[in-house]
Amino acid sequence: MALSFSRDRTRPLPFAAEIGALGVVFGDIGTSPLYALKQGVLAVGGTNFLGGDVLGLLSLITWSIILSVTVKYVMLVLRADNDGEGGILALVTLLDLHRSALGMRWYLLAAGLLGAAMLIGDGVLTPAMSVLSAIEGLQVISPELEHWVVTLTVLVLLAVFLSQRLGTERIASFFGPIMLMWFGSLGALGVYGILQAPQVLAGLDPRYGIMLMVNHPGLAGVILGACFLAVTGGEALYADLGHFGRPVIARAWLFVAMPALLLNYFGQGAILLVDPNAVRNPFYDLCPDVFDIPLLFLATAATVIASQSIITGVFSLAKQAIELGYLPPMRIRYTSEHNEQHIYVGRLNWLLMIACIAVVLGFEASDRLASAYGIAVAFAMVTTSILFIAQVHRSWGWPAPAVWAMATGLLTIDFAFASANMTKIHDGGWLPLSIAAAIIFVMVSWRRGLEGVVAQQVRFTEPLDSFVARKDRVNDVEAPRTAIFLSRAGAMTPVALSRMADLLKVRFEKAVIVSVWIAARPRVSVEDRVKVTTLNEGFVRVDLRFGYMQQIDVPSVLGPALSARGIDPDAAIYVIGHERIIPPDEVTKIKDVVAHVFAFLARNAERSVDRFGLPRARTVEIGYPVKL
């Protein structure tokens, strides 16, 4: 039975939505003070930095946050919602690409898939980077505990991933208050540091950032790449738009998250001006010794919440890609009876866990992992800007000069960050790029293979109208019950129906042809979900439409429509086709490799009976070969 999800967003307490947003939206960017400024100082020269270098780094971080997060995401991109949902794939569907010229359509689609793959790849690195940076606080408390850092990080990550299948609905209500405590602590520590060296506030002047780049031309890319770590969580603001909406996210950012982050960065900068040796870990050195242990626990909790948000975001992104036909079906379990956003994708969770732990064991320290971190998000931000600019040009009615001015500003910043992160490739940046490349290859292989299967079905089966009108089936054996056939190509006869008629000479008293369509929007209302067409006395065609964020449960949606026409849905059987993919015997071209990858994915994909929620006891699968 389908779960009934409530989307009531009324809140009994003032600012409850904003506090909730702190726990869901700002986990990634909220934990960046653990490592961002430290990596910037190391990029400049470690303990050999000058006071002006610190002010320059603070200037770059400050204006990166203002321009890349506040202006780009909060003021602009968050306005581009698809029925309330955000994220790269939501932006792709919002563009309605079938209206684009063929060449532009593929460019925009490629940008969207690239960005989605980059964000999924980032899901491997972000939990590792965040938790490892938090646990490294042990080294500040006691250098003798250094050898426990990797072990404890792995244990925390194991706990995070193994708990995913249980769902987080019961404890999610604590995420917001914990993150409120975290941001409050960031701000308080920042003020404490600034009071020790108020001159650090000169770093608000953008000229210090420019001078830093001019004084270190050979390190400009490395420095900018390190400063980018302060804004890597910006994409999450858009991805989580559907949870809270733009006004709530904007208020939480402008009045809580951003002030706390800036205060903490400047507090760390002040400590560095007072004690250059604090470069070993300026975040923990900012804290008075008596609060080190509580801060360690709070930082670990914050990074666990940040990791949870990233994992949930990857699950959501994967579900969108599955429903839009870019990833093979995987079993998706809903872990909440009230919120359709709470899902668990088992196979993906295990893959993420193994990859994440492997990253920790391979890099062992956040300083080394920072060399790989950020490049995937930088490219994802570029693709978001490209798609957003296309949407503004197409649908917002802005004059061309305004669009060009905005495009120039956004892309200048994004390409600067992307170019700076390219310097990380040889030090580990190849890892997220390789993960993203593998994901893109899987997406393309699945999509191409799926199109090939549909093309063969269209080629070798007759139009449904023609099949229904045939007179040569009057002597077939009639089964006195209703059969429901699922069709992938709506206007064509389902292969299962065609094979039963041609090979078994069987026809049913009533045949219901059901096509499931995924709309280019996150949700389809109940009244728009079902369309029934009576073809003749023995055939009924039903088109079911779902949004790409909705649970697909065919019996629960189809049942009332059949009952209204005198058909007992509980007495009907479901007949579905199951393709046995046969790839080429020899691999001589790239398309042959794609065919073999698709065949592997198809063998391991979730079966239709599970994906569509069909009753196993009343479902018949008819297999047939499809040679690619």
UniProtKB/Swiss-Prot annotation:
It catalyses: K(+)(in) + H(+)(in) = K(+)(out) + H(+)(out). It is a multi-pass membrane protein. GO terms for cellular component: plasma membrane. The chain crosses the membrane at residues 15-35, 49-69, 106-126, 141-161, 174-194, 210-230, 254-274, 295-315, 343-363, 369-389, 398-418, 425-445. GO terms for molecular function: potassium ion transmembrane transporter activity; symporter activity. It holds the Pfam family K_trans_C. Keywords: Cell inner membrane, Cell membrane, Ion transport, Membrane, Potassium, Potassium transport, Symport, Transmembrane, Transmembrane helix, Transport. Coiled coil: none annotated. It is found in: Cell inner membrane. Transport of potassium into the cell. Likely operates as a K(+):H(+) symporter. HAMAP family: Kup (MF_01522). Belongs to the HAK/KUP transporter (TC 2.A.72) family. This is Probable potassium transport system protein Kup. The gene is kup.
